[in-house]
Amino acid sequence: MAALGTVLFTGVRRLHCSVAAWAGGQWRLQQGLAANPSGYGPLTELPDWSYADGRPAPPMKGQLRRKAERETFARRVVLLSQEMDAGLQAWQLRQQKLQEEQRKQENALKPKGASLKSPLPSQ
């Protein structure tokens, strides 16, 4: 049984993504394009055909899916940005309150006279 397993195992062709599969990816990124040519761009975003009278073709499933993914991503970015802004404002308000409390403690009236000379009562 083990021999059969090794025969089947060695008979399987291994497919992998090598460096050659990503050839040109770095150049495309430097040019402001997608690393993968089918990632985004006119070939994936524009319709494949149009009507003879010039009307655009209805959007395909892939286009609708990509549009929905982009919308969800944009909504998530806006939500996280708003959360960051709210957190930053709360932190700044907290820092202002702490500074104000510290300033009040520094500017508080200091005891003078006999209370300074006499030792503090022990409890």
UniProtKB/Swiss-Prot annotation:
**Ranges in coiled-coil conformation:** none
Where found, per UniProt?
Mitochondrion
Query: What are the start and end residues of every segment in region (Disordered)?
Result: 99-123
Gene Ontology annotations for the cellular component aspect, listed alphabetically: mitochondrial inner membrane; mitochondrial large ribosomal subunit; mitochondrion; nucleoplasm
Keyword terms: Mitochondrion, Ribonucleoprotein, Ribosomal protein, Transit peptide
Q: Name one GO molecular function term.
A: structural constituent of ribosome
Residue interval of the organelle targeting sequence: 1-23
Q: Give residue spans, biased composition: Basic and acidic residues.
A: 99-109
Biological process according to GO: mitochondrial translation; translation
Is Transit peptide among the key words of this record? yes
Tell me how this protein assembles: Component of the mitochondrial large ribosomal subunit (mt-LSU). Mature mammalian 55S mitochondrial ribosomes consist of a small (28S) and a large (39S) subunit. The 28S small subunit contains a 12S ribosomal RNA (12S mt-rRNA) and 30 different proteins. The 39S large subunit contains a 16S rRNA (16S mt-rRNA), a copy of mitochondrial valine transfer RNA (mt-tRNA(Val)), which plays an integral structural role, and 52 different proteins. mL52 connects the central protuberance to the body of the ribosome.
Task: Please report which protein family the annotation says this sequence is part of.
Answer: Belongs to the mitochondrion-specific ribosomal protein mL52 family.
Q: What is this protein called?
A: Large ribosomal subunit protein mL52
Organism from which the protein derives: Homo sapiens
